[in-house]
């Protein structure tokens, strides 16, 4: 079966649990139509490059699937009809990469803290101590 990667953007006013519920919903749609979801990631709330339906932010979800094209078409159709989903992107890939997606790797790099090659950080002065 062909391999696919899907990115879903849901409305910003959903809770995290509701956004993760959408991932489970679309995973079951793929499974019910003869495919399987290999991996899924919830990327969290991110700022959009431009407004979509008057929203500046959205919940991002990432799915890797191994499914026939009919299952993917049905999942996309239901996602486009769903009120909470603003955008869907599906890409066919030759193989799934092991490990976390590039977006998750970038987030992990940002959360590592200070870089060791920069030396020690100076203490910040208060604005009142300018003299």
UniProtKB/Swiss-Prot annotation:
Top-level taxon of the source organism: Bacteria
GO molecular function: small ribosomal subunit rRNA binding; structural constituent of ribosome
GO biological-process terms attached to the record: translation
Region Disordered: start-end pairs: 92-131
GO cellular component term of the entry, any: cytosolic small ribosomal subunit
UniProt keyword annotations, A-Z: Ribonucleoprotein, Ribosomal protein, RNA-binding, rRNA-binding
General function of this protein: Binds together with bS18 to 16S ribosomal RNA.
Annotated family: Belongs to the bacterial ribosomal protein bS6 family.
Record-linked HAMAP family: Ribosomal_bS6
Name of the protein in question: Small ribosomal subunit protein bS6
Organism lineage string: Bacteria, Pseudomonadati, Pseudomonadota, Alphaproteobacteria, Rhodobacterales
